[in-house]
Amino acid sequence: MFSNIDHKAVAALLHGQGCANILKTVLDNCKVSSVSTEPLINTILDSFSLALSSVNSPNRQPHHESSSRDMAGLVPQRSSKKKICGVKGLEIYRDDSPNPRLDDGFTWRKYGQKTIKTSLYQRCYYRCAYAKDQNCYATKRVQMIQDSPPVYRTTYLGQHTCKAFGVHDNTYGSEMINFDQVVSESVMRQLATIGEQAVLMEDEANHIMNQEYDINDYLVDDEVFWGNEFPLFSSEDLMLF
């Protein structure tokens, strides 16, 4: 039944579904109405656009070919880095390593931390320390995904435009980060702040909703949905953000 399913389209729809659930929670609670919902709304619209463009693409590859490449990428490695599909014009890189990459050649400032429903470990969010001073919109998130053996996943989003980029352009960190030049500064700013806005919304909604019930009961988890409906495939390689 799902032999011709398009990975990219499904991933985009699942991502939009998750954002829609968060948006519903925010709108249902007047106490969090002061939080800007524009980034979530834009993300939901982009998810539908990406799904439609993927389904209608004349160059779409057969499912079994792309699936074989995805499965090959799941072989455990000591340390691996992978380019992840993103929004048009945006490239995201992910790195799995036995130790957290605290020194990747750049200076980061932590701006958020949250508990992930399907994980025992919290996810930490960072942005470039020069985000305000030099309008550098590079961000990253770090999360331990298993403890035996330990594996830390670092996801990089955006390219450093600060002065530090020229000093460290040969470091491991700069190799992990890339933005297509077609992305304008205004788009970069919007994409870089979506993660931060989502964290603020979820934290505030959790604070209110947990007074009576758990907000997670109202959020559909992509990985659980994917595992139940499409057990032959993994959602990890389809992560958009």
UniProtKB/Swiss-Prot annotation:
Example GO molecular function: transcription cis-regulatory region binding
Keywords: DNA-binding, Nucleus, Transcription, Transcription regulation
Disulfide pairings: none
Keyword Transcription on entry: yes
GO cellular component, one term: nucleus
DNA-binding stretch(es), residue numbering of this chain: 97-165
InterPro entries for this protein: WRKY_dom (IPR003657), WRKY_dom_sf (IPR036576), WRKY_plant (IPR044810)
Pfam families (alphabetical): WRKY (PF03106)
Span list, region Disordered: 56-79
Predominant localisation class: nucleus
KW Manganese (keyword) present: no
GO biological process, one term: regulation of DNA-templated transcription
UniProt subcellular location: Nucleus
Function: Transcription factor. Interacts specifically with the W box (5'-(T)TGAC[CT]-3'), a frequently occurring elicitor-responsive cis-acting element.
Family: Belongs to the WRKY group III family.
Protein name in the entry: Probable WRKY transcription factor 63
Organism taxonomic ancestry: Eukaryota, Viridiplantae, Streptophyta, Embryophyta, Tracheophyta
